[in-house]
């Protein structure tokens, strides 16, 4: 093997074709997402009914605290900036970068990480079709604020974002779900105690960010966390059963 080939082998655990295939998988998922988005967007009245149901349920539980959280965050320009960037970057940029990092640095963990994200997101997308839900920012009469619309130059009406996002995708919170999956996987592969602590805190911070920007109810966040844990458990048990019968 030539020196160049040896260096490429070290950089790419399974070669260029395998890496390209991973990108194709995510492109396929994006196509599926757009199809689901189109289906969920049609039932606008249902999305608002479901959003009101979530609000009334939380109110009945005595836990409609999101407007209070929003007022606290909106009083600080630093918190508004941090939570806004977290909302925009956590689901795609952070997920994408951690996938690449695990692919190159801990390749033996990559397939499990990828599969967990894909399965959990597909289940979440089914939820968007069955239960489209308008987010808090669409209910100003309840005291919610569209933080991104008021304070950020990038908001849900911005060109590419308006095209690519689903406005009625509150339940469950895929931001929170993905953040928990990323946090668990990264906790398992990083070495320093500080890094482990930061990755454990990551899903909690993302949950706080999506609530404080008016994009999710706390029930959405809880549902996202539960979905992440359930799909992870199912995949783990499936893998163990497969190994036993191998």
Which residues fall in each region the model found?
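Hydrophobic transmembrane alpha-helices
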Residues: 183-187, 228-236
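Aromatic-anchored segments of alpha-helical transmembrane domains
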Residues: 31, 35, 121-130, 201-212
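Alpha-helical transmembrane segments of integral membrane proteins
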Residues: 13, 17, 21, 25, ...
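Membrane-interface loops
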Residues: 37, 44-56, 103-194, 242-246
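N-terminal transmembrane-helix/juxtamembrane module of multi-pass inner/ER membrane proteins
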Residues: 2-93
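Hydrophobic alpha-helical transmembrane segments
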Residues: 85-100, 175-183
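Interfacial helix-loop-helix junctions of multi-pass membrane proteins
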Residues: 135-142, 166-170, 204-231
